Amino acid sequence: MDIRNEFLQFFHNKGHAVYPSMPLVPNDATLLFTNAGMVQFKDIFTGIVPRPSIPRATSSQLCMRAGGKHNDLENVGYTARHHTLFEMLGNFSFGDYFKEEAILFAWEFVTKNLGFKSKDLYISVHEKDDEAVKLWEKFVPFERIKKMGDKDNFWQMGDSGPCGPCSEIYIDQGEKHFKGSEDYFGGEGDRFLEIWNLVFMQYERSNDGVLSPLPKPSIDTGMGLERVQALLEHKLNNFDSSLFAPLMEEISDLASLDYASEFQPSFRVVADHARAVAFLLAQGVHFNKEGRGYVLRRILRRALRHGYLMGLKEAFLYKVVGVVCEQFSNTHAYLKESKEMVMKECFEEEERFLETLESGMELFNLSLEHLNENKIFDGKIAFKLYDTFGFPLDLTNDMLRSHGACVDMQGFESCMQEQVKRSKASWKGKQNNADFSAILNAYAPNVFVGYETTECCAKVLGFFDSDFKEITDAKPNQEVWVLLEKTPFYAEGGGAIGDRGALLKDDEEAAIVLDTKNFFGLNFSLLEIKKALKKGDQVIAQVSDERLEIAKHHSATHLLQSALREVLGSHVSQAGSLVESKRLRFDFSHPKALNDEELEKVEDLVNAQIFKHLNSQVEHMPLNQAKDKGALALFSEKYAENVRVVSFKEASIELCGGIHVENTGLIGGFRIVKESGVSSGVRRIEAVCGKAFYQLAKEENKELKNAKIALKNNDVIAGINKLKESVKNSQKAPVSVELPVEKIHGVNLVVGVVEQGDIKEMIDRLKSKHERLLAMVFKKENERITLACGVKNAPIKANVWANEVAQILGGKGGGRGDFASAGGRDIENLQAALNLAKNTALKALEG
């Protein structure tokens, strides 16, 4: 049975609108991941947005519960039901039908469509919900209905807001397999399994805890697809169902182990985590050091550790992830489209961790021998595993689980705090919270007038030294912080540097403004004092002319993000930025280097919007209204209820508090000067506009003129080609480079990197020297990695070998069975490419 389709069709026939699964990354700053079916309807339930015209909905929602409040990660593999990623089937009523219909629909679907026997079904209700008891008694005898308290049968969205009792349908799996003391209805055993939760949202809880009836009660239900699939197949464990069979087969083949072996928990961990990795990567989450990216990294590393237990010492998870992409390609087409990218990024992350996994495991095993009698694992060692070897804390605890031990959290946290102190970013002098507390008590937030003007009269409220201790006056040649009653200087934020400028007194320059920062809601400017100033002085604050150039680069950054999303896809999201007067730097999520065609398209799109002379528009509106308009926002930012929205007509709309040009025409022009990788899944573009754009054009024109003179040819390309030919002819002998040769099963294996020389000639020399050969030589040149490979009387084709390795470098290979070449721009992946080249060759030789 196709349970998903059966469920959606059933409720569609009952007048429900069918909604697609929303992304795993919700447009909700309070959630790390989408963790329930009701998330996409949250604003409807809370009344933020009006009810839809069809007040009934149904969906099959992909959910993630790993990290944050809802975190099942540590239980996966050890229980029958826990998953990081699962599908939640649900039906919803927005003030339309209520308990009677919800119970009727649920009973009909469970007994008729799913075919569960009514004698095996049990019901739980809230202890005060007599109405639900009476409704259930139409289908179930009273002795199979159990009243429970708030802990089990009362649901609420938060400390205040919509809430209500809930009712759950349980199924008796039979006493044949469950004979524990807790295996009774209402006990802690697994015999009676919850399959469907019906939430009756009928109250509003006020801030002081008082419950008031809602004028239009609603329904929210949830049922796990994986759980139902296992029940229909009479399996006692979700992982034993046909949903996971293709994954178990792949893992079994890779590890040469049987699923029913002692490694069964590890099979289940790898299968579950492969699903999570595939969907998260395909939906634009990338491996990172924080936030969702770090949760993804933790999931992958936990899977690798369980693979290690099964003897898998090389990258393997990417192959299981590939099976996930194929398995779900019919219901989630984007998995098929992004399969290559997903597998590549997974492989690269595996390679990075495998470099330290072996050493980390050695340290872990050695430390196990010194466990104290309380089985407390040294917190300092746990921190070293985390900090040096990349072992997330929950991974270390997971490894300790089988030894009945746990980490000394106090020791771990102590090491973490020490590291935070060492690495904490600081400006000249360090923040002193006690001093800031005194400042905040003494001064109200100063008024920022920089949106309206670049100059204003202002009163000096106070001066502060580098430790933010208040001083009464400022003397020439001192560097001090100043707090003005009102200020036109924009504080560093949103990637833009702080304003610079000057303070005038009596028509003379009294201080140079070096920088502006916001600390705890107060805008401070850093001054270099030229003329003595004191508290209470009236000054004229002037913003430097470079403000306009910063604004040009800031507006260009907005246009750049929109262009990237149009060219590369909606998975692109900001990962960091820097906006200065002479350049911009924009970091964004994308799995591979941009090729020349993509870069040209992005640059052309930005310039097209500049040449349209689009006016900027600044609006203030509620956060949800801004999101509904499609405004881009940073998940890491905490936004107020009302936000500032900057748009350039249809070209760009973002939440932003920064300074922008009034018209895109003022940007002048836009040029990308560099594209590079920052980390796995994060790319960086550096660009210029405005005066810097003009200056770059001047410099390039000058270089072009000098090149013509040097080449003695007005046609530079022709001159360069002539010079290259001359150099080639002048080379009397090839560069001799000796690379290490390994002999394996009679075949000479060469994999290495050279700094100079013709790598194709090197391959030819190696082929003439050896009767049996597998050789791949890499060379770094012009921000690219090129490779050449040769095969002679060996069990692999050169073109297949080269193409597989080239994908790691963000490129493709081509050639014949005996010789091939390739290249790519992901130079940061050179080591991973070397590892893959050698491992592929070794497998071919071993096979």
UniProtKB/Swiss-Prot annotation:
It is an enzyme of class 6 (ligase). GO terms for biological process: alanyl-tRNA aminoacylation; negative regulation of DNA-templated transcription. It comes from Helicobacter pylori (strain Shi470). It is found in: Cytoplasm. One of its GO terms (cellular component) is cytosol. SUPFAM superfamilies: Class II aaRS and biotin synthetases (SSF55681), Putative anticodon-binding domain of alanyl-tRNA synthetase (AlaRS) (SSF101353), ThrRS/AlaRS common domain (SSF55186), Translation proteins (SSF50447). It catalyses: tRNA(Ala) + L-alanine + ATP = L-alanyl-tRNA(Ala) + AMP + diphosphate. Coiled coil: none annotated. Zn(2+) binds at residues 554, 558, 656, 660. It comes from the Bacteria. GO terms for molecular function: alanine-tRNA ligase activity; aminoacyl-tRNA deacylase activity; ATP binding; tRNA binding; zinc ion binding. InterPro entries: aa-tRNA-synth_II/BPL/LPL, Ala-tRNA-lgiase_IIc, Ala-tRNA-ligase_IIc_anticod-bd, Ala-tRNA-synth_IIc_core, Ala-tRNA-synth_IIc_N, Ala-tRNA_ligase, Ala_tRNA_ligase_euk/bac, DHHA1_dom. Belongs to the class-II aminoacyl-tRNA synthetase family. Consists of three domains; the N-terminal catalytic domain, the editing domain and the C-terminal C-Ala domain. The editing domain removes incorrectly charged amino acids, while the C-Ala domain, along with tRNA(Ala), serves as a bridge to cooperatively bring together the editing and aminoacylation centers thus stimulating deacylation of misacylated tRNAs. This is Alanine--tRNA ligase. CDD domains: AlaRS_core. Its EC number is 6.1.1.7. Keywords: Aminoacyl-tRNA synthetase, ATP-binding, Cytoplasm, Ligase, Metal-binding, Nucleotide-binding, Protein biosynthesis, RNA-binding, tRNA-binding, Zinc. Its cofactor is Zn(2+).
